[in-house]
Amino acid sequence: MRLRCVAPVASIVLTALLTASAGAQEVKEPRTGVSFPVSRDGMTLLGVGVRTKTFLKVKVYAAAFYVAASALAGPLAAHRGHTTAPAFYRDLVWGDFPKAIVMTFVRDTTASQIRDAFYEALPTIDHARLDLFSSHFGTPQKGQTVVVRWGPGGVIETTSVGNVKPPIADKAFAGAVFGIWLGEKPIQEDLKRDLVARAPEVLRSP
């Protein structure tokens, strides 16, 4: 079921992100207590949030979004001061530069739950492709992390609980995957906003 959450707690996340000291090495997602480093593999943290499901808002995973520092100084710099505009999100989704969604699960999952979540989020994508992608996640348990990374040319690189999976070379699919969180019809509106909450800070003029 696609979830469109209105977020009364969005201001909590924004406050947590923007009040972190300039020298902070981590940012904590306040609703789950999961912390993420502000930099990772040459990429800069743009924001953190939590994926929830059902009207009870059951927490599934804490998420962080990272973008290459070179992209922030390069093509994305044109969006300085306009980080809520659709064009900014389009460039985040489709721009061919390193970026990653990092998910730390806060509850146990099953393979069928992961698969069905992708079926729901990407209803127009071939199920065989989604079966392959979801199989790369395995069955993440509470406290385990899965990373979905955009490689050069639009290659999806998945690392599940430290295990690197075979890449999927398909730029259209890569864009669809990142659109799950950041596209025009995201799985969760407040999560979409939270994942770029640091953008005004990291894109500010020198």
Task: Label every model-predicted segment.
Residues 1-5:
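N-terminal secretory signal peptides that target proteins for export/translocation
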Residues 8-19:
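Bacterial N-terminal signal peptides
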Residues 24-87, 93:
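N-terminal secretory signal peptides
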Residues 29-32, 150-154:
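A short, compositionally biased
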Residues 70-151:
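Mid-length scaffold segments of soluble, non-membrane domains
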Residues 159-164:
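Short strand-turn-strand beta-turns centered on an Asx-Gly dipeptide
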Residues 165-191:
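Flexible glycine-rich active-site/ligand-binding loops centered on an Asp-His dyad
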Residues 190-206:
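Cysteine/selenocysteine-centered motifs that mediate thiol-based redox chemistry or coordinate metal-sulfur cofactors
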